[in-house]
Amino acid sequence: MSNSHPLRPFTAVGEIDHVHILSEHIGALLIGEEYGDVTFVVEKKRFPAHRVILAARCQYFRALLYGGMRESQPEAEIPLQDTTAEAFTMLLKYIYTGRATLTDEKEEVLLDFLSLAHKYGFPELEDSTSEYLCTILNIQNVCMTFDVASLYSLPKLTCMCCMFMDRNAQEVLSSEGFLSLSKTALLNIVLRDSFAAPEKDIFLALLNWCKHNSKENHAEIMQAVRLPLMSLTELLNVVRPSGLLSPDAILDAIKVRSESRDMDLNYRGMLIPEENIATMKYGAQVVKGELKSALLDGDTQNYDLDHGFSRHPIDDDCRSGIEIKLGQPSIINHIRILLWDRDSRSYSYFIEVSMDELDWVRVIDHSQYLCRSWQKLYFPARVCRYIRIVGTHNTVNKIFHIVAFECMFTNKTFTLEKGLIVPMENVATIADCASVIEGVSRSRNALLNGDTKNYDWDSGYTCHQLGSGAIVVQLAQPYMIGSIRLLLWDCDDRSYSYYVEVSTNQQQWTMVADRTKVSCKSWQSVTFERQPASFIRIVGTHNTANEVFHCVHFECPEQQSSQKEENSEESGTGDTSLAGQQLDSHALRAPSGSSLPSSPGSNSRSPNRQHQ
């Protein structure tokens, strides 16, 4: 027996879902005029409708049709202005069925439809229509779409329009839609640093807009032109004959151009957020340095002593360097570089940016710091075309090596102090390329692996002999640090004493915590005046159980959320006797010149206990 019913959506047993049938039946009321009790007139076309359905779907119609006004009278005819019959037909279909077909409609109808969704208070429809408009943006429709998105404060659609116009600035300037922009929308576009068309083209487009919009204030429009970015020839032969700018304004622009540093001019640049633009895709190339081809190939795994990096000799006058030319002037505030890290060497360096290869501005200065592996660098946003990395020191030889280079604009928030990042998250992690360069452990970086649960008498900690050596952590790059947190080995009731020092070069050390006269157990929170740090040295001075200082976990800066989690979890711990367990010292490899420490249980002078 055939089934004439359409396929129904799957529902759970015991649940009935016939919403699609309801939509079809209510939608059928639109076909005829049965039961209609109100009529809308749009562009002389009559639209019969049903008050109760409109009121149930829309607060606007509820107030209009049941608010005691003239429109609430039986069989009323309501004329609607500022819309089209096509758009209103789509809206009624959506109200009655919850469906709308956008793909076959012209952009003008879709924008009218979006306007109705906004006017009558259908936020979900507004969002869905905006999302579709984002997918069909082109040179012909982007300006009128931006105008509507700005008028109704639609952030996602506005942002997508801006990104499209930024990447197609010159084509947008010459489009017919540009001439139809409102003054507010026009200024919002051309005032953006990322609207990166030549200033002469922007001036000519604004001049053309002024001719088509003669009633607007032309002086206000022309203030958006960045005259100092134009050449003397352009100012005299293009701007001056237009008569829209005073001779004083032109002379002021010439003065600024001649007296200012080039990098102080208010340049425009391409903006592509969260995407590396130092790639062949965007036309970037390495123009100075040795072994240029390796730097931008994207390979951050296959490199060794012989290949996979770019380099330059380190000289005293810093004339050598590695220079990257971007495909076009771009706005950046974030650079990532991978320093060669197949051994324990460290480097020092600085980074400068320029528009013309003559005037350079230093955005990163790590020339006095020791750095290794991945460098995650942030600075105030700059427009630049050229980027120069100059190595000033290598702890092994006189060559500076870089494996990879990336640059971009990021919307990620960051805080800078004295040119260094003030980290909010723990940067003493393996993922952030921190490492333990002094101290003994079964696993080299057990101190930094984030495991604060799985440790016992034999493993899970880093240690050093009291009176000999220390535990030293090297961060990948200098940070402004004002706190650290330690977990001292606490599988019994012993206590420790210690002090903490920080350094940027392993030569000069500053003590930030002195707990040599304090009995310390388990979690240690250390706060101090914020200062630059690349190295943190923890020196144990006393252990009530034996002659070894043991540390399970290290982080900086201190992570408050994890502190609370640890406190809540520790409240349920218990004790178990583990007398007689010893560390297999043959599993450890002590640094040269250091004596091999014993396990926490060796020479114990206190009861042996361990967390369950």
Curated annotation (Swiss-Prot):
GO CC aspect terms: cytoplasm; glutamatergic synapse
Annotated stretches, region: Disordered: 560-612
Stretches with biased composition (Low complexity): 588-612
Taxonomic source organism: Homo sapiens
InterPro entries, A to Z: BACK, BTB/POZ_dom, BTB_POZ_domain_cont_9, BTBD9_BACK-like_dom, FA58C, Galactose-bd-like_sf, SKP1/BTB/POZ_sf
Domain spans labelled BACK: 142-240
PANTHER family according to UniProt: BTB/POZ DOMAIN-CONTAINING PROTEIN 9, BTB_POZ DOMAIN-CONTAINING PROTEIN 9
Polar residues bias (residue ranges): 573-584
Protein name: BTB/POZ domain-containing protein 9
Clinical condition linked: Restless legs syndrome 6: A neurologic sleep/wake disorder characterized by uncomfortable and unpleasant sensations in the legs that appear at rest, usually at night, inducing an irresistible desire to move the legs. The disorder results in nocturnal insomnia and chronic sleep deprivation. The majority of patients also have periodic limb movements in sleep, which are characterized by involuntary, highly stereotypical, regularly occurring limb movements that occur during sleep.
Residues annotated as domain BTB: 36-104
Domain of life where this protein originates: Eukaryota
Gene assigned in the entry: BTBD9
Tissue: Detected in the brain (at protein level). Moderately expressed in all specific brain regions examined. Expressed in the dopaminergic neurons of the substantia nigra and A11 neurons. Highly expressed in kidney and moderately expressed in all other adult and fetal tissues.
GO BP, one annotated term: serotonin metabolic process
